Each structure stands twice: as structure tokens, then as C-alpha cells.
Amino acid sequence: MAFAWCVRRSASKLASACGQARSISAVVNRPSLALNPSPLSPFVSRGFLYTMAVDKLSSEQTLHLVIDSELNSALQTDDPNLNEEMAPGSFPLKIRDKPGDQSVTLTAYYNDERIHVDVGMPYLGDDVIDVFGPNNDELSFPLVVTVIKKNGVSIEFTCQAYADYIDLTDLTVHDYQYQMGETDWPRFKNLDDNLKKAFHRYLATRLDANITKLLHKYMVSKIKREYLLWLKNVNKFVDG
């Protein structure tokens, strides 16, 4: 069962919960239940409380089974070679990734430039791609690459990162030395095509195709890790 299933089912779960609430309300307000009231409640019979207890036990057992299935599915699809590929010395950028955070920060140096990369989690809408399936290469991640010169001037690239390329969508120039602040005009889409190509090449020199591919694999793996963390927290709740 896939992660996407959980995302898509939120609306139906809400409708189901509302239906259960109406059913319980109908049972509680039946006149026959008032003939033999429970000492615990003037409105609910002992039989009703027993049925509710059995239903609760059954639902918890079912939830445990589903969570175990999801955990096994996520663990079986993890990439065993990823840690080696992303290890210092193999991957040129230093990664800062805290469990539970929805973004990853990477830093590196290129000649006299300091490169700072922020990668966010993708938006998982109704048509989300199954991250446990074979088509997760189609996922894209929001990416902001900041290149900082020694003189303090920097340029910030706003992008979408795919498995095999980076789509540059906008850029901003910062020059605090002369109190220019931010300059985000003209918009990237309005630039001359040759200038656009030059910026794409400039960015690709600092984040080449191999880095892009590994970064995409790492972020897909992070989605799975965060999902596993969420499942384990749900398990703790059920066990409590």
C-alpha cells in the first residue's frame, strides 16, 4: 500500500468519521436504551458499551496490521547504495538534514564562491506520484541555490529539481555592500534567450548532472524516511 494512498484518502476518512458519528448518535438516542440505563451513563446501555469496546479492540488490531504492512513496504524499497553514494568524499556537497524537517541544506565551495543549496519537499497533491513505485523520477523538488562571492555579492537561483535536470525559473541578485538589497528584476522569463542559456550553464557547472541525480535520489529517500517516522509515531499512539 503506497504513501499516496494515505494522502488521497483524507477526504473519504473525514466523510466516514461523520457517518460513524451519525450512527452512534442514532443508537444513543433510541428510546429502548433508556429502559435499562447503565450506572455509568443514563443514556448508554451495558451492551452498547461492550460492543464499543470490541469495536475499539478490532480497529486497533486492524490499524496495527496496516501500519506493519506500510512499514515493510517502505523498508523494502529503500536504496541500499545511497548512503555510500552520499558519503563525504563521494558527494561534493556537505549535507545538513534533521529528521522531521521538511527541507535539506547543502553547502560547498567552488573556486572563490560559497554555494548554499536549500531543497524542500515536493507538494503532494491529489495526483501525487507513488514514491515507492518505479515512476518517482517524475517527482520534482523546490530548489534554491545561492552563490556568494567573496565581495559579498550573491545571486540566488529559484529552481525545480528533477531526476535528470534542473529547471531554472527565476533569479535574484543581492549586493549589500552598496545597499542595493535585493534585485529580482527583470524576471528570468523575460530575459534574452542567450542570457537564459548562459545562466543555465553557469548553474549546471556548479550542480552538474551527477549531483542533480544523487540529490533527487536523496530527497526521494527522505520522503520515505519521514513517512517511516510518521508511521512509527502513529504506532506509539496506538500502543499507548
Curated annotation (Swiss-Prot):
Any one annotated GO CC term: mitochondrial matrix
Keyword Transit peptide: yes
InterPro entries, alphabetized: MAM33 (IPR003428), MAM33_sf (IPR036561)
Subcellular location: Mitochondrion matrix
One Pfam match: MAM33
Domain of life: Eukaryota
Keywords: Mitochondrion, Transit peptide
SUPFAM superfamilies: Mitochondrial glycoprotein MAM33-like
Family membership noted in the UniProt record: Belongs to the MAM33 family.
Name this protein carries in UniProt: Uncharacterized protein At2g39790, mitochondrial
